Amino acid sequence: MKLMFASDIHGSYYYAQKTVEAYREEKAEKLILLGDILYHGPRNDLPKDYAPKKVIELLNGIKNEILCVRGNCDTEVDQMVLEFPVLADYGLLRVRVDFLH
């Protein structure tokens, strides 16, 4: 199983698009998002192409391929608009590793 990990999109449609493009190009089976999906946080500048509604639409389009844990900028409101579960501050993932020698 090929997994792709990404984090800290912070509502940037530009970076969300780049993430999904890389995910598709790599032909990964799951996209693991490590939090900070929509909101940029009060301490951060607005990210490039800040458009959380467009990010929502893009990610909801591949909702069955996403596993996500909550970041420090994610809120319960995010879960109301995202159609995939934003898990607690951690997630458990069973991974089988095979070695060929």
Task: State what each model feature region is.
Residues 97-101:
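Short hydrophobic-aromatic micro-motifs
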Residues 2-96:
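Core catalytic region of metal-dependent phosphoesterases/phosphodiesterases
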